[in-house]
Amino acid sequence: RTVFCHDPLLRGAIRLNLLTDRVDIVRDLGWRRNTSALTDTDVKYLLLYFEQNYGLTSEKKMTAALSIVANENCYHPIQDVLNGLVWDGTPRIRSCLHHFLGAEVSDYVEEMLKHFLLGAIRRVFFPGSKYEEMLCLVGGQGAGKSSFFRLLAIRDEWFSDDLKKLDDDRVYLKLQGHWIIEMSEMLATSSAKSIEEIRSFISRQKETYRTPYEAQPKDRLRQCVFGGSSNTLDFLPLDRAGNRRFLPIMIYPENAEVHILEDEDASRAYLLQVWAEAMTVYRSGHYSMKFSKSIQRQLVEVQKDFMPEDTEAGQIQGFLEHYTGSMVCSKQLFKEALGHTYDEPKRWQLHNINEIMNTVVTGWKPFSNPRMFAGYGRQKGWERDVSGNELPGNEDEFVELSEEECRQLELPKEWIA
């Protein structure tokens, strides 16, 4: 340890990289090296140096001292870069995606990108901090979506697009040492077993595993965020409860001011200023990682544009637009709206109808106390919402009930003495 701390050549050269969780040699020590990370060859050179200059030959003691000194002299390369940025005062976050990819300039696009940038910054300064969303760029091939994420990572080694499967036992190796990870063309998403698996993976805050060189497993707090890209519009899974993990932005490369690879140095300089602006927001503390209600509503509507067509929801909504009754139940919708006249619904089919009525259909509200439905018995269901603009006519006017509604309101004969 004394040699590592006081030797003129070695002093300050051995540092623990908090991003990669590996020991780095951060300056030239006199032999050829291809990477900053400590290798077996480096250990052999160091052992030779110790033997020739100090007569020390114990590799075990040297490597133990090396680990201690590295841990005492740790650093985080991304933190160092971000802390060194100085913003020139020109706002770029709002127009960044338009500049490179032709996305519209709007509050929605600005908030999505700013949210992603702040999530990435927080993950670096507070590893494992909660960030459950994935920025998704949607548009034609060759627009520069992957290049945008790569250059946004500042250094190429801090970017990865090698995540192909979410259920890989060694997925942690794909994350370690990277800051921005692109799920290229959503391959990782589309091969996942379920929507819940995708949500669980994105929202995870740590990985727990043991490397071959460690005796005990260790929690690795996540320092990365995820970006997605797709050439197809319906890349989101059909999830009526919401795809809140995904933040889609449509790009129009023909509207871009410049292709991101046209002048890579200029693009990198531009993106450094984007990070500098984001760091200014981060340092101010005047931000929230929760979207405003207005942005949340926009996000839900935008997400619908990127989901497969929901045919059953359309059938039910169309049926209700011409339905004259004031109440419906799920069994009634199964038979009358979806056309299963002679079939009995399975539990999952009723659950599907409930989800549609509670999350997609407008103009109806649920009631929890079972009511009588002609031909369907006592059922929970939905009643027409006549509040606000949904009110049919003046609320003080008498509304005549249809024959079907009268039948629904009748008491069961067994209740009448």
Question: At which residue positions do the language-model features occur?
Answer:
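DNA-recognition alpha helix
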Residues: 330-342
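Conserved AAA+/SF3 P-loop NTPase catalytic/coupling segment centered on the Walker-B
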Residues: 180-202, 236-242
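AAA+/SF3 P-loop NTPase mechanochemical coupling elements
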Residues: 171-176, 211-229
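N-terminal nucleic-acid engagement/recognition segments and initiation subdomains in replication
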Residues: 1-92, 107-111, 343-344, 348, ...
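Conserved alpha/beta core segments of nucleic-acid transaction machinery
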Residues: 281-325
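A short helix-turn-beta junction within AAA+ P-loop NTPase domains corresponding to the substrate/partner-engaging
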Residues: 238-256
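P-loop NTPase catalytic core of nucleic-acid-dependent motor ATPases
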Residues: 66-176, 180, 338
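Conserved catalytic/switch belt of AAA+ P-loop NTPases
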Residues: 195-218
